[in-house]
Amino acid sequence: MNDLAHMRTNYVRSVLSEETAGFDPLALFSLWFSEAKEEGELEPNAMSLSTVNTDGKPSVRIVLLKGLIRNEFQFFTNYSSHKGKDIEQNRNVALTFFWPKMERQIRIEGTVTKIPKEESEAYFKIRPRESQLGALTSNQSSVVVSREELETKFQTLEKEWEGKEIPMPESWGGYSVSPNKIEFWQGRAGRLHDRIVFERKNENWIRSRLSP
């Protein structure tokens, strides 16, 4: 670990100009996301979700983007989890995408709400059966005695629901993040990175360039 001071990458892949950024951050996000997929980034829909509880304590974890619906970012999880409890207390969240092959990062700040139950159920029905059973098995973020306890419960539920449609747990569903700030970062040589930020004022997006 003593050589960390000498670890660095020189970013030379691309540039981000005002002309290429345009004035619609959601269109730019969709473009960058498509390019990340084409580049073969590992799980380009993986994003860090940052939450803060009422005591001001932050938490961050990786979740998967499952849709950009009605100009909002959707993900699914257990409502009783640590993140779910934080969100109940504080609806302000942040998302971060990092695509190292593209030398790009996107930061999103906004407010989060639960999506309608019928939309969560529609998504739950198309999940792989093992994932459905996993959601039914796990009381996310609760303490378990051992891995074996989880596997035994999974196997029991697998037999119980064999040949039947697995119901969505009441504690499981989707969230939707309405963005009010989106920042695009493109790595550049000499650490003079490009940073373009969009901030929502009423129904309009205001674009600015930030110093790196």
Curated annotation (Swiss-Prot):
Where, in this chain's numbering, is substrate bound?
8-11, 66, 123, 127, 131, 191-193
Task: Name the Enzyme Commission number(s) assigned to this protein.
Answer: 1.4.3.5
What Pfam families does this protein map onto? PNP_phzG_C (PF10590), PNPOx_N (PF01243)
- Metabolic or biological pathway: Cofactor metabolism; pyridoxal 5'-phosphate salvage; pyridoxal 5'-phosphate from pyridoxamine 5'-phosphate: step 1/1; Cofactor metabolism; pyridoxal 5'-phosphate salvage; pyridoxal 5'-phosphate from pyridoxine 5'-phosphate: step 1/1
Cofactor, how bound (note): Binds 1 FMN per subunit.
Please tell me whether the keyword Flavoprotein is annotated for this protein: yes
The highest taxon in the source lineage is Bacteria
Q: Which GO terms describe its molecular function?
A: FMN binding; pyridoxamine phosphate oxidase activity
Show the catalytic activity: pyridoxamine 5'-phosphate + O2 + H2O = pyridoxal 5'-phosphate + H2O2 + NH4(+); pyridoxine 5'-phosphate + O2 = pyridoxal 5'-phosphate + H2O2
Give the protein's cofactors: FMN
Which key words tag this protein in UniProt? Flavoprotein, FMN, Oxidoreductase, Pyridoxine biosynthesis
Q: Which GO terms describe its biological process?
A: pyridoxine biosynthetic process
Signal peptide start-end = none
**What is the annotated role of this protein in its UniProt record?**
Catalyzes the oxidation of either pyridoxine 5'-phosphate (PNP) or pyridoxamine 5'-phosphate (PMP) into pyridoxal 5'-phosphate (PLP).
Q: Give the family, as the similarity comment puts it.
A: Belongs to the pyridoxamine 5'-phosphate oxidase family.
> Which HAMAP family does this UniProt record tie to the protein?
PdxH
According to the record's subunit comment, the protein's assembly and interactions are: Homodimer.
**Could you identify this protein by its name?**
Pyridoxine/pyridoxamine 5'-phosphate oxidase
Annotated organism of origin = Leptospira biflexa serovar Patoc (strain Patoc 1 / ATCC 23582 / Paris)
